[in-house]
Amino acid sequence: PATPSRTGGVRMADIGDSGVSFENVAREWRCKYTPGASGGPGDSASLKACQDLLTEYLPKLKELPKASVTRQVCGGCMDFKVSITQPLEEHGAWAGADYGPLEEEFIAKLKAIDGVSQVETQEITFEAL
C-alpha cells in the first residue's frame, strides 16, 4: 500500500510487511556485449554500438517526467545496463503506456547490434539510502 504525503500525493510504497519502502522505480534495460580483440571492453565494437544507441536516446529519455538516467558497464562480465528512474507516480504513467514508445524502439535496436545477447528489461525499486 502507498503512503499518502501531506499534500495528498503518493510518496512511498511498501513491499508487504518486508520493511522495504520506496518512492522511486527504475526501468532497467540490459544486455551482454562481446569483448574486443584484446579480451576487454576498451576495443569492443558492440559496447561502442550500445553506447552510441544510448547517446541517441538519452535526450528522449531525459524528457520523461522527473526521470534520471544512469548507465552501468562491467568490463569483467560484459554487462551494459541503462536505468531510467522516476518517482512512483510518473513511473506509473510510463509503465501504464507499456514504456512506449521508447522501450520498444531501444530494445529492438539493441537486439540488432552484432555481438549483443541476453537483452532483458526489469522494473525495480531504486532508492538512495
Model segments located where?
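Short S/T/G/P-rich N-terminal loop/turn motif that feeds into the first structured element of a domain
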Residues: 3-80, 85-104, 109-129
